[in-house]
Curated annotation (Swiss-Prot):
Protein's name in the database: Der GTPase-activating protein YihI
Compositionally biased region (Basic and acidic residues): 9-25, 34-45
Record keywords: GTPase activation, Ribosome biogenesis
InterPro entries xref list: YihI (IPR007336)
Entry GO MF terms: GTPase activator activity
Residue span of region Disordered: 1-65
Organism field: Histophilus somni (strain 129Pt) (Haemophilus somnus)
GO biological process: ribosome biogenesis
Domain of life: Bacteria
Length: 186
């Protein structure tokens, strides 16, 4: 078999060099593309598909177009509420516009407690009883504790006067004990 000299001629089986690239428009209209042309075309399409992301250096010169797009869109008036919702609640008892919160309403609710019930609550108050026990033991109380004890005792005296309950002193109890005739109980 005779040897054949290598040629630099482009054939269908040879890969295309960058310098040999032909524009795709030169393909024959109406005729079927050759295998070589189909391969070149598919390679170009693959490059286009493979390319993702931003161009080189676009990080520094990129302009946010997303903000302008959002502003240009028309909002549907049926969607969402027009009333603005505060993210941080600053004033809990702040009235709405046009509404009025009477200042005496809170005081009236506090005063509606039954005096007898309030008296029993004060008498059964554990912290007050503990502070009174400490006073009886001869300990000195702090200013806050002394003020608390004085306020509670004043309120108890006020409620007892309001209900008509009189506190019997120890001297009265001794007198009644001494004056009792024991023969009555036999």
């Amino acid at each position: 078999m005779a040897r054949t000299k290598k040629t630099r001629r482009i054939t269908d089986i040879m890969p295309m060099r960058k310098t040999d690239k032909r524009p795709e428009n030169l393909s024959r209209p109406g005729k079927k593309l050759t295998r070589y042309e189909l391969d070149a075309k598919s390679r170009e399409e693959k490059k286009k598909k493979k390319r993702k992301g931003l161009t080189a250096g676009s990080r520094h010169s990129a302009v946010d177009t997303s903000k302008t797009i959002v502003l240009n869109e028309k909002k549907d008036p049926r969607v969402g509420s027009r009333k603005k919702v505060p993210l941080i609640v600053e004033f809990v008892n702040k009235p709405e516009k046009g509404m009025f919160i009477p200042s005496g309403a809170l005081e009236e609710k506090a005063k509606t407690i039954d005096p007898m019930l309030e008296l029993t609550q004060l008498e059964n108050n554990e912290s007050l009883n503990q502070l009174l026990d400490e006073l009886d033991a001869g300990k000195t109380l702090s200013k806050k504790d002394q003020i608390f004890v004085n306020q509670c005792l004043d309120r108890i005296a006020q409620l007892m006067a309001e209900l008509g309950i009189e506190e019997e002193s120890e001297d009265d109890l001794y007198r009644t004990f001494e004056t009792i005739d024991i023969n009555q109980f036999k």
